[in-house]
């Protein structure tokens, strides 16, 4: 993918707060199931914003940084998802979201970001991303010094 969308820590916090506001009132939720690993940070932020203490994980493996591969369910909570928010950082192709819908038909599936191929599978999200754009999450990056332009020419 040639295009990149970079999400800073501040932006992630803001996006998650916006997503949390859409989930009010918080009392309707039994808990949050964060999809590992991308949904862990958004799940923690949502848990804080909504005052939810019951947080668990759904562990589905389908990516090796930038390459999609076969989907494997490593860990999954019991039940049909009723009363739970399932939190993802991104819905891309929709493959993981389809699997989550199959596993937990009564859960509310939400994500911070959505691409067109998977957006219809979500109940809520806050950021539209073009299908041909790669997202760089803040936990995948570091801040580093960049040489000023005028020094490069010497």
Curated annotation (Swiss-Prot):
Protein's name according to its UniProt entry: Xanthine-guanine phosphoribosyltransferase
Annotated positions binding 5-phospho-alpha-D-ribose 1-diphosphate: 37-38, 69, 88-96
Catalytic activity: GMP + diphosphate = guanine + 5-phospho-alpha-D-ribose 1-diphosphate; XMP + diphosphate = xanthine + 5-phospho-alpha-D-ribose 1-diphosphate; IMP + diphosphate = hypoxanthine + 5-phospho-alpha-D-ribose 1-diphosphate
Location in the cell: Cell inner membrane
Chain sites annotated for binding Mg(2+): 89
GO molecular function: guanine phosphoribosyltransferase activity; hypoxanthine phosphoribosyltransferase activity; magnesium ion binding; xanthine phosphoribosyltransferase activity
One Gene Ontology term, aspect cellular component: cytosol
Biological source species: Vibrio campbellii (strain ATCC BAA-1116)
Cofactor(s), by name: Mg(2+)
Pathway field: Purine metabolism; GMP biosynthesis via salvage pathway; GMP from guanine: step 1/1; Purine metabolism; XMP biosynthesis via salvage pathway; XMP from xanthine: step 1/1
InterPro entries membership: PRibTrfase_dom, PRTase-like, Xanthine_Guanine_PRibTrfase
UniProt EC number: 2.4.2.-, 2.4.2.22
UniProt entry keywords in alphabetical sequence: Cell inner membrane, Cell membrane, Glycosyltransferase, Magnesium, Membrane, Metal-binding, Purine salvage, Transferase
Alphabetized CDD domains for the sequence: PRTases_typeI
UniProt binding sites for guanine: 92, 135
GO biological process, one term: GMP salvage
Subunit and interaction comment: Homotetramer.
